[in-house]
Regions:
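Ribosome-associated RNA-binding proteins
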Residues: 1-182
């Protein structure tokens, strides 16, 4: 058995789960609703207010899908009940972010502004011109948008300036050593 796939997923009181045809799962909660379709090799059942994920056979592909399906379902349940957030910070002189409706303009030492639009279900907030918060119910979308923002100017390995996740430790490389006189 898969160590992750064996674990039960507890369903909070305010979350409703429907299992449709072809493993089409819809999860509804106070924050919104998510739907996803999973492979037929995996069985998904609801018993005693928890979700049980099992597999039909012990083929290699089924084993790999077992833990993945359980993790994706757990992310859906947590997303509709609590939601997900990723925070980023901009370090350095001249690095700023500006909110423009649902989009943000990033000034990251380029000749132009980087404009990043928030897709449906994702909200982007800018605080103090240097702190950015990405939030939503879909963990994959939140992480993807946060990664796009970070990739606009990743931290410089020598100075540490750039866009980084809040609390991210950037290991700095040593600079050039002074050349020894002969």
């Amino acid at each position: 058995m898969s160590r992750i796939g064996m674990k039960l997923i507890n369903i909070p009181e305010n979350v409703e789960i429907n299992i449709g045809k072809n493993n089409n799962i819809s999860v509804k909660g106070p924050k919104g609703d998510l739907t996803n379709t999973f492979r037929d090799e995996i069985n998904i059942n609801i018993e005693n207010n928890s979700i049980i994920v099992t597999r039909n056979n012990d083929e290699k592909e089924s084993k790999s899908l077992h833990g993945l399906t359980r993790s994706l379902l757990n992310n859906m349940v947590i997303g509709v009940s609590k939601g997900y957030t990723k925070s980023l910070e901009m370090v350095g002189v001249g690095y700023r972010a500006e909110q423009k409706g649902s989009a943000i303009n990033l000034s990251v030492m380029k000749s132009h502004l980087d404009v990043i639009e928030a897709p449906d279900g994702i909200t982007i907030k800018v605080e103090d011109n240097t702190k950015i918060t990405v939030s939503g119910i879909d963990k994959q979308k939140v992480g993807h948008i946060a990664a796009i923002i970070r990739s606009s100017r990743p931290p410089n390995p020598y100075t540490g300036k750039g866009v980084r996740y809040l609390g991210e430790q950037v290991s700095l490389k040593p600079g050039k050593s002074a050349r020894a006189e002969i």
